[in-house]
Design a protein with these regions (language model features):
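N-terminal leader/targeting peptides and immediately adjacent processing regions
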Residues: 1-16
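Alpha-solenoid HEAT/Armadillo-like helical repeat scaffolds in large eukaryotic proteins
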Residues: 5, 9, 27, 68-69
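Extended alpha-helical scaffold segments
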Residues: 20-21
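HEAT-repeat alpha-solenoid elements in large eukaryotic scaffold proteins
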Residues: 35-46
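Core helices of alpha-solenoid repeat scaffolds
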Residues: 59-63
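Amphipathic alpha-helical binding modules
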Residues: 75-116
């Protein structure tokens, strides 16, 4: 999967990110901006916002997408999730929230295995 494909999939699953995505990527490569950059700089802060504001529908859609990326056979998608979403999420917010109630099985398993 390319960054463009992954970004399109993200925006399809989470249309609430479109404005932030467009603002952030307007001075970069647009839809082809690297997914590592997108997930770490847009999706991580967005996920904390939706958790804090208890937007359960959006939380569910986001973590369903993350789970699909983890269980996919696509190495790039798996790498983006681990390195640019789960690792920063755990490093910055791992002790603040009960992610076991939010994340799906494989996502939480990978998240729990990360050490900081």
């Amino acid at each position: 999967m390319t960054s463009k494909e992954l970004n399109e999939k993200l925006l399809q699953a989470i249309p609430e990110l479109k404005v932030s995505f467009n603002d952030f990527t307007s001075w970069q490569e647009g839809i082809e901006t690297g997914s590592h950059t997108i997930f770490e700089n847009i999706v991580v802060p967005f996920s904390i916002d939706i958790i804090e504001n208890e937007k359960d529908d959006v939380i569910g859609r986001l973590f369903k997408l993350v789970e699909e990326m983890i269980v996919s056979k696509d190495e790039y998608a798996q790498e983006v999730v681990q390195l640019s979403f789960l690792e920063p999420l755990k490093a910055e917010h791992g002790d603040e929230y009960d992610f076991s109630k939010i994340m799906l099985k494989e996502t939480y398993s990978l998240f729990s295995s990360l050490e900081f």
